[in-house]
Structures are given as structure tokens and as C-alpha cells.
């Protein structure tokens, strides 16, 4: 039997993800792709960047760039919203980037909306506030001092601007959609910020890749880059300053997983992508 996109992006699941996965749509990547293609052509905000031990972690930026480049090819105008730890990551691919200050307020975000008038918003591995209004890592340690409040956009414009969240641990923007399930199973205070569609993956990058594979099938066009390109991009971010979110080391690994595992996931998604294009 052919593996689904969701089965691929949930390989090697840990941290209670198989449990909370029950509360997410079986075909969440397809639904995300369908939602994106329903948006009017224009600006799409993409946000990522998760602070870990003085750096941004390697999970998030790669998936965001892959998704942003796919959106460009489909006629959208991706704009990256992030903060200082991701400085220089997105300029590598000439993507328009806004660095949101740590003390940003509602006026900051109102001006962003008025300036760009986004047709949709996507978050990939971006920490969101918990019920105590804190941004916390998987160990429950506050990283609020190092996290711009970009999730305010998803709160203030819920129901106004369509949104998609991609996460893998429970503390990311979008997880508010299943916060109750996370609270019951995982030993952390979940993010309470919801999105219209939630994609849960073992690694958030994989969730973003899964959305791109689903987009490919719907438009009949290969949008997913080859593994060597993805590895090269992650390597460049590590050289700039990015760490593995599990080991906290400046290595070309993601959430403790090697590039061999990354290649395995990309290869599996490429098979599905090719099948969708040929269908």
C-alpha cells in the first residue's frame, strides 16, 4: 500500500506526537495545500525561528524556505517574518524578510498588515504563547526575552486572515487548536494560539515539505527541491549560526536526526509527489 504524506512526515514520532496526531486531520497536508491554493494571489506571511541556547534552531527555516520558494513559483509573494536569531538565513535565497523587534506591539502588527495586506499566514516551528502568556521551550524554560511576539498576528487576525500552523512539540503557533489534548498527554504547557489548519509532524521541516508535496500533486508541477539542495541550505544556516534543537550543537542535524534521515524523508515525499503529478 502506498504511504501517505502524513505517514511519511510522522516517521520516528516521539514526545507523545502519535497520541495528539489523533486530533488532527488525517490528510492535513492536503487540506493545507487546498487552503493555500484558494487564496487570492498576493503576499503570504511565513514565520519561523525558534530560539535555542543563543541561536535559532535548524528546524523551521529550511521548511519555511522550501515552502516560500514553492509559493513564489505558484505566483504568490512570500514575506518572511522572524527575529534576530535568524538574521541572514532568508537572504540566502533573496526572500523578503522582516525582522520583528522583541518589543513589538499591536501597532507594529497593524502597520505590517496595512503595508503588506497578506492573503494568508503560515507558521513553521515558531514558538507561541502559553496560557501564562510566556514563550517556553520543551523543558518549560521561558524564552520570552528572545522571542518576538509574532504570534500576536495569528491572535489578532484569527478569522480575518486564513492561517496554517506547522509544529512538532506542542508549544508552536497552531497547537492551540488541540491544546486540551496536548495538556492531557504531554508534560508541557501548550501554545494556546490556534490556526485554521494544523499540520503535525515528527520534525516541523518535514511538515512544510509535506505541504509542498501536496501542492505539487494539486498543480501537476514538481515543487519539492532535491535533498542535496536542502542539505546545502541547512549547512549554510549552521555556518551562519544555527543549532540542533535537541543537541544544542552547531551541526547539520535537525532535532537530533541526521541528514541520512532527512534524505529518507525527502525521497519518500518525492515518490508521492511524482505519483501525484502523474495521476
What are these model-predicted stretches?
Residues 94-119:
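A glycine-rich helix N-cap at a beta->alpha junction
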Residues 76-83:
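Short internal beta-strands
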Residues 1-43:
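Positively charged, low-complexity intrinsically disordered leader regions
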Residues 173-279:
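C-terminal functional extensions of proteins
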Residues 43, 119-120:
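Structural motif
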Residues 57-75:
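Histidine-anchored nucleotide/phosphate-binding helix
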Residues 60-61, 120-221:
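Conserved mixed alpha/beta catalytic, RNA-binding, or beta-rich assembly cores of soluble enzyme
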Residues 20-24, 50-62:
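Short, glycine-rich nucleotide/cofactor-binding loops
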